[in-house]
């Protein structure tokens, strides 16, 4: 018996057995067992393995993504075909030839194609050759990697998926052709496919015909070599070590190569690998946002989310809860809220407080789409299907790529929703009306009039978000009847996958810009803490020197003002006055004076005595403060800039630290100020590049390495 259940000339006992899960619902449900984070960790592990062994039924999204992008020889992934599949593949190929020789009438073997399948021929080989010729209808423009050429990574993904389908032995193709495609992949030889021209039903006919064109040596076929060089078919075969010359297609083999969903599902696999990473990133960034915004962590309390029942929401909240649990920022914010409960609203705004409720459904959608595509890349999706065991060809429609179109539309909408949340959080972060004491635009210079910080980045974020929201519109409701109304409904799977790839790219732009802004906010909180410490110490010392003693050495009633003066320093936002702390136009000096005035008004009869008058002390207090405070503030800032701050950065005590450390230390980004030359875009570029090449994954997962997969107990 062959691995696909075929018995040459006999019955298929495997498929005749009664299944405990005949409709596959239990299998689909079982695939969602466990946490999304564990699934992402597994995907990352699979992505990094050096070998993908194809057998037809166990290919994963991560493996497709690995073959697609890890194509450099130093870090390449190799493909190996299961020898167990050879017999089944040969059985279906032999069946087609026997059927042809017996005169059996089969679609695409003895008939024409689609709406013209009423035509008949006995010249099966020539029919396959014509199939590839007329499907070579794509337009490239000039070059091999133009705006009209499918990205080579997507082509590699398509080649892998198509091999996996054909290995299952229901397609009537020789094993040697699958070996040749495998050699092309392993040698980094990538056929050039047109970007457009497929409706993914009947499969991705037009782009897949260019892979077949290379295999058959068509003169218009091109490929790209390991170093980006352009190759014709002969050169591609030589570099890949494919011996024996070009393939003369036997009956059904051309149809087997082109009549499937591999291009759409291959690109969808790449898109979903990135989408899952970005979904986890959005959870981590939301937690960091809560930290730098002095957020109230109760929004992650498990009872709230348990009562809502949705698993994506429960997991998102639990992940944020884990990062915030024990956070130094949360502890400091709690003291702040207790000291002055009216300083900020009782509840945080929706972008923070409802982030688990917002992200949860998006994670569920992305996870469901991933499972749908994994089923698709392990499916047999051409037509007709060769059932050797029952000695028949089945004429159906597995080439209809609806799972791709639907899952990609859904995933793209989820990505747009994640981007919308990021933009809402970013907008709060840079706005000093909402960000709980951070400077407007996250400016960090001594002179805010010459530093506009992330203003340009916010405009860019609005642009990204607008384009992302546009891309959220569905593709699948734009179906046109095609091929003389034979293909009157079609999935548009690859088009939707391409649009989702664009959405992923834009969400990476948003995520990288947002992460740079969060790191800026972390450093501003560090600066704030050090400068406020300097202000507090200076006010305390000046108060002791000027308010404690009277002119004759007696204790002065003004000494009782110190505690309230320090409370003013604690409550006043540092960046509201930091550029000129003694300015009478800024709130610090105004409120310090008001404390002394209020005490003087309550000083009663003592105020009439010059020696005990608090009013008489105000001038001396303010004069000395003006002489000392600006120098102390500058000294504290200089100490921080030289790496010797009085108070260390709180982020080092937080579970979110690995991501901050990566951005600052490994990528070499820095606090952005108007005093320096470096622009926000330069720093965002570094993070974006790290996201695109996968460097960001490990520090992101390190933030969650101690999470046990469950919320904190309710007690």
From Swiss-Prot:
Contains an active site 4-methylidene-imidazol-5-one (MIO), which is formed autocatalytically by cyclization and dehydration of residues Ala-Ser-Gly. This is a key enzyme of plant metabolism catalyzing the first reaction in the biosynthesis from L-phenylalanine of a wide variety of natural products based on the phenylpropane skeleton. The modification 2,3-didehydroalanine (Ser) is found at residue 202. Pathway: Phenylpropanoid metabolism; trans-cinnamate biosynthesis; trans-cinnamate from L-phenylalanine: step 1/1. GO terms for molecular function: ammonia-lyase activity; phenylalanine ammonia-lyase activity. It holds the Pfam family Lyase_aromatic. GO terms for cellular component: cytoplasm. Belongs to the PAL/histidase family. This is Phenylalanine ammonia-lyase. Induction: Rapidly induced after wounding. There is a cross-link at residues 201-203 (5-imidazolinone (Ala-Gly)). It catalyses: L-phenylalanine = (E)-cinnamate + NH4(+). Expressed in flowers, roots, leaves and stems. The gene is TPA1. It is found in: Cytoplasm. Its EC number is 4.3.1.24. The active site is at 107 (proton donor/acceptor). Coiled coil: none annotated. PANTHER family: HISTIDINE AMMONIA-LYASE.
């Amino acid at each position: 018996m062959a691995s696909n259940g075929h018995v040459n000339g006999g019955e298929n006992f495997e498929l005749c057995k009664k299944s405990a899960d005949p409709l596959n619902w239990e299998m689909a449900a079982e695939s969602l067992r466990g946490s999304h984070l564990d699934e992402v960790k597994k995907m990352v592990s699979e992505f990094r393995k050096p070998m993908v062994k194809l057998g037809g039924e166990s290919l994963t999204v991560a493996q497709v993504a690995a073959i697609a992008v890890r194509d450099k020889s130093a870090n390449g992934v190799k493909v190996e075909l299961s020898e167990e599949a050879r017999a089944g593949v040969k059985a279906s190929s032999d069946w087609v030839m026997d059927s042809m020789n017996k005169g059996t009438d089969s679609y695409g073997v003895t008939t024409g194609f689609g709406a013209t399948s009423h035509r008949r021929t006995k010249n099966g080989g020539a029919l396959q050759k014509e199939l590839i010729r007329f499907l070579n209808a794509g337009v490239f423009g000039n070059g091999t990697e133009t705006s009209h050429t499918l990205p080579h990574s997507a082509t590699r993904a398509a080649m892998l998926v198509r091999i996996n389908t054909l290995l299952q032995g229901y397609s009537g193709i020789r094993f040697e052709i699958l070996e040749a495609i495998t050699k092309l992949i392993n040698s980094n030889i990538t056929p050039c496919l047109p970007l457009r021209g497929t409706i993914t039903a009947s499969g991705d006919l037009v782009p897949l015909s260019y892979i077949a064109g290379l295999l058959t040596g068509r003169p218009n076929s091109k490929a790209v070599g390991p170093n980006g060089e352009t190759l014709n078919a002969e050169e591609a075969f030589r570099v890949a070590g494919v011996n024996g010359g070009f393939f003369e297609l036997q009956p059904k083999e051309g149809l087997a190569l082109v009549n499937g969903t591999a291009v759409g599902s291959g690109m969808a696999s790449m898109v979903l690998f990135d989408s899952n990473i970005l979904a986890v990133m959005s959870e981590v960034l939301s937690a960091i946002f809560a930290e730098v915004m002095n957020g109230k962590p109760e929004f992650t309390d498990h009872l709230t989310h348990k009562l809502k029942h949705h698993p994506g929401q429960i997991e998102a909240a639990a992940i944020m809860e884990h990062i915030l649990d024990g956070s130094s920022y949360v502890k400091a914010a709690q003291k702040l809220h207790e000291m002055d409960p009216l300083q900020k609203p009782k509840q945080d705004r929706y972008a923070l407080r409802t982030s688990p409720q917002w992200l949860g459904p998006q994670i569920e959608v992305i996870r469901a789409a991933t499972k749908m595509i994994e089923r698709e890349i392990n499916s047999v999706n051409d037509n007709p299907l060769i059932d050797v065991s029952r000695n028949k060809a089945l004429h159906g429609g597995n080439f209809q790529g609806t799972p791709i179109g639907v899952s990609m539309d859904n995933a793209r909408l989820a990505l747009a929703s994640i981007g919308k949340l990021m933009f809402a959080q970013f907008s709060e972060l840079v706005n000093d009306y909402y960000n709980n004491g951070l400077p407007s635009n996250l400016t960090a210079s001594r002179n805010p009039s010459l530093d506009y910080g992330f203003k340009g980045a916010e405009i860019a974020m609005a642009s990204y978000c607008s384009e992302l929201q546009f891309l959220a519109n569905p593709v699948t409701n734009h179906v046109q009847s095609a091929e003389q109304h034979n293909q009157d409904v079609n999935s548009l799977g690859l088009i939707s996958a391409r649009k989702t790839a664009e959405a992923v790219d834009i969400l990476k732009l948003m995520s990288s810009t947002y992460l740079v802004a969060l790191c800026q906010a972390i450093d501003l909180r560090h600066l704030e803490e050090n400068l406020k410490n300097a202000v507090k110490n200076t006010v305390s010392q000046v108060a002791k020197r000027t308010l404690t003693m009277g002119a004759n050495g007696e204790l002065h009633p003004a000494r009782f003002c110190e505690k309230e003066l320090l409370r003013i320093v604690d409550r006043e936002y540092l960046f509201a006055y930091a550029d000129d702390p003694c300015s009478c136009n800024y709130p610090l000096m105004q409120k310090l004076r008001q404390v002394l005035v209020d005490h003087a008004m309550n000083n009663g009869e003592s105020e009439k005595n010059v020696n005990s008058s608090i009013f008489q002390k105000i001038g001396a207090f303010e004069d000395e403060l003006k002489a000392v405070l600006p120098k102390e503030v500058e000294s504290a800032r200089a100490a921080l800039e030289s790496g010797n701050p009085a108070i260390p950065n709180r982020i080092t005590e937080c579970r979110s630290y690995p991501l901050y450390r990566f951005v600052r230390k490994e990528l070499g980004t820095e606090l952005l100020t108007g005093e320096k030359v470096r622009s926000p875009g330069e720093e965002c570029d570094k993070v974006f590049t790290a996201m695109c090449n996968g460097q960001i994954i490990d520090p992101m997962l390190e933030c969650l390495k101690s999470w046990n997969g469950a919320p904190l107990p309710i007690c």
